[in-house]
Amino acid sequence: MTARAVRGTKDLFGKELRMHQRIVATARKVLEAAGALELVTPIFEETQVFEKGVGAATDIVRKEMFTFQDRGGRSLTLRPEGTAAMVRAYLEHGMKVWPQPVRLWMAGPMFRAERPQKGRYRQFHQVNYEALGSENPILDAEAVVLLYECLKELGLRRLKVKLSSVGDPEDRARYNAYLREVLSPHREALSEDSKERLELNPMRILDSKSERDQALLKELGVRPMLDFLGEEARAHLKEVERHLERLSVPYELEPALVRGLDYYVRTAFEVHHEEIGAQSALGGGGRYDGLSELLGGPRVPGVGFAFGVERVALALEAEGFGLPEEKGPDLYLIPLTEEAVAEAFYLAEALRPRLRAEYALAPRKPAKGLEEALKRGAAFAGFLGEDELRAGEVTLKRLATGEQVRLSREEVPGYLLQALG
């Protein structure tokens, strides 16, 4: 059997890889302009980091993690999300004594054992941003703005910002009690997943993908979480709204918005794209003031977001954003004799890295060499024949115009740099 990439994973190269690189580079520009420090965490952590941080009752922990034992018997997990690992790093490296808030960002692969579909993979890539060390609602608004700016800076326009609040723990306890009271008599009408959620975390039913569940919620007229907010959580949300309005960030309140991670408190938000189908959320985030305590540290309030690189690439494609063809070499050297092959290699090495130089690995007839240079998208072809070797020269041909010139090897770098601008 021929080896293939595992289902739900893919190799990245060419245009697709360059699109990923462009997305991450744009995020770097936006986030580092806001003072965020880049962080790179390991791709696996002790399993308890996610069990405690993400929540043992979440779908991610119960069904979607890739978990294994190391040779010492420790349970380790490939990271399914970035926030818990970034907060762990903040605690481990004593960032609490730095000037607060500490803004961090990270880009890299995440892993979830999900059913692969368009825009959703078992290995996927995220950009994460976290601001740790303050409860100020300005930071919540800043996180929304930064996510929106990352996507706008890429050129995306068909964006919808959805804002909500999941309240404080006491608010959620009241809301979960209400949901159990309303939904328990109709338990058998729920999907199998939501029957489990009814016991573990009823709020997650609001986010169910089951049409049956959504129809039942509508039929019963289930009230939104926003109706159960306490005074402090309500005031916090109002402040976030005020800041967004002051900055003219278009948003809509989404009462049914529930993030899939247990650590969220108060602010929750998502940015959706209008034209990428069922998986329309490009990214989202919220506030998580108690996460550090779940990981064994002191209380450190925080807020952040993540967006999926593959999802954003789909949105860019839907809006017609492409990338130019990959740039070919500045110079493609064509040896005309066996002896000239090594000389082509030596000259290419002398030109790199200032210039992109490639060469044929065997003698070519001029017409064949020109054909190869054109296929590679080269700006210039360089011929090395017996005459050129004897004289220590190269014949250069500009492929766009057919203009030809013969130069000493020492003159080649300067000529090409000037000609290529």
Swiss-Prot record:
Reaction(s) the record says it catalyses: tRNA(His) + L-histidine + ATP = L-histidyl-tRNA(His) + AMP + diphosphate + H(+)
GO molecular function: ATP binding; histidine-tRNA ligase activity
Organism, scientific name: Thermus thermophilus (strain ATCC 27634 / DSM 579 / HB8)
Name used for this protein in its record: Histidine--tRNA ligase
EC number, UniProt record: 6.1.1.21
Keywords, alphabetical: Aminoacyl-tRNA synthetase, ATP-binding, Cytoplasm, Ligase, Nucleotide-binding, Protein biosynthesis
Location of this chain's protein in the cell: Cytoplasm
GO BP term, example: histidyl-tRNA aminoacylation
Xref: Gene3D superfamilies: Anticodon-binding domain, Bira Bifunctional Protein, Domain 2
GO cellular component: cytoplasm
Domain of life: Bacteria
Predominant location category: cytoplasm
Family annotation (InterPro entries): aa-tRNA-synth_II, aa-tRNA-synth_II/BPL/LPL, Anticodon-bd, Anticodon-bd_dom_sf, His-tRNA-ligase, HisRS-like_core, HisRS/HisZ
HAMAP family per record: His_tRNA_synth
Record-stated family: Belongs to the class-II aminoacyl-tRNA synthetase family.
Keyword hit for Transport: no
Subunit structure: Homodimer.
Region (Catalytic): 1-171, 229-320
